[in-house]
Amino acid sequence: MAVQQNKKSPSKRGMHRSHDALTNPPLAIEPTTGEIHLRHHISPNGYYRGKKVIKTKNDD
């Protein structure tokens, strides 16, 4: 079992965790419907880059 030789100081602990922070997801606004969705993903209405690409339940 691995055991540390010396206690890690708060500064070193912070340096170790420096890459663990979460970033905000990249959001985009669909130009036709105005809905917010993840970039490079289809909006909830089935639109992608201004074109209808899939049928949804609300379609007639």
Swiss-Prot record:
Cellular component aspect of the GO annotation: large ribosomal subunit
The protein's name in its UniProt record: Large ribosomal subunit protein bL32
UniProt keyword annotations, A-Z: Ribonucleoprotein, Ribosomal protein
Family annotation (SUPFAM superfamilies): Zn-binding ribosomal proteins (SSF57829)
InterPro entries the record matches: Ribosomal_bL32, Ribosomal_bL32_bact, Ribosomal_zn-bd
Family: Belongs to the bacterial ribosomal protein bL32 family.
Residues covered by region (Disordered): 1-43
GO biological process, one term: translation
GO MF term list: structural constituent of ribosome
Highest taxon of the lineage: Bacteria
Organism, scientific name: Nitrosomonas europaea (strain ATCC 19718 / CIP 103999 / KCTC 2705 / NBRC 14298)
